[in-house]
UniProtKB/Swiss-Prot annotation:
It comes from the Bacteria. This is Toxin protein Tse4. It is found in: Host membrane; Secreted. It comes from Pseudomonas aeruginosa (strain ATCC 15692 / DSM 22644 / CIP 104116 / JCM 14847 / LMG 12228 / 1C / PRS 101 / PAO1). The keyword Translocase does not apply. The keyword Membrane applies. The gene is tse4. The lineage of its organism: Bacteria, Pseudomonadati, Pseudomonadota, Gammaproteobacteria, Pseudomonadales. Disruption phenotype: Deletion mutant together with deletion of its cognate immunity protein Tsi4 leads to a significant loss of fitness advantage when placed in competition with parental strains. GO terms for cellular component: extracellular region; host cell membrane; membrane. The chain crosses the membrane at residues 20-40, 116-136, 140-160, 171-191. Toxin secreted by the H1 type VI (H1-T6SS) secretion system into the periplasm of recipient cells.
Length: 195
């Protein structure tokens, strides 16, 4: 069996996904998104978290049709956006990192820096999936950002990125229905926070 380039052993948590809502927008390759996630704690309490981030992405699609006088065009750049309400169908799983030996996640493990990836496709209505690594080490994150800022230290930043991803307390995997100004598909990676 081949080893993943960034091994992060995960197990299912006793926290359960309840629902989520969110939205995002892209202009050319720049992306931003945010939302709300509701989880059921092992004690049976609904706990809400907010998240947001900025990043970059790629997409493949066709030009959106013109709606009356509304033309979603920014001089030579593609623009898109989609969102999901809690009422729309969605599903998810909460995973805990093996590094939390002998215990499950606590509320504090979820908050702090996070990295996430979103994949989506649709024609007005569509579907999307999100994978969030949460509870990243903030000191490692700052070190990776500094090291990656210069071509002279980029190799150091790349090796520290592996440590940063392995510092994660867990992961959230979510998928659901969305609606918006979309006519194709795309993927984006974000750096943000869960709070």
């Amino acid at each position: 069996m081949s080893q993943l380039p960034i091994p992060l052993p995960l197990n299912e948590s006793r926290w359960r996904y309840v629902t989520a809502s969110g939205g995002g927008m892209t202009v050319a390759f720049l992306a931003g998104s945010g939302g709300s996630i509701t989880l059921l704690s092992p004690e049976g309490e609904n706990v809400s978290f907010r998240y947001g981030g900025v990043g970059g992405g790629i997409g493949l699609g066709m030009r959106l049709p013109r709606f009356g006088k509304v033309n979603l065009n920014v001089k030579g750049k593609s623009v898109g956006g989609a969102g999901a309400l809690e009422a729309l169908p969605s599903t998810g799983t909460v995973l805990v990192a093996d590094g939390l030996v002998g215990r499950d996640l606590s509320r504090g493990d979820f908050t702090g820096p996070c990295m996430y990836v979103e994949l989506g496709a649709g024609v007005i209505a569509g579907g999307s999936g999100t994978a969030i690594l949460f509870g990243l080490d903030p000191k490692l994150l700052a070190a990776v950002a500094l090291a990656s800022a210069s071509p002279l230290t980029a190799a150091l930043g790349a090796s520290m990125s592996r440590q940063l991803l392995q510092s994660s307390r867990g992961a959230l995997l979510m998928a659901g229905v969305n609606v918006g100004a979309q006519f194709g598909g795309g993927a984006a990676a974000y750096l943000g926070a869960l709070f």
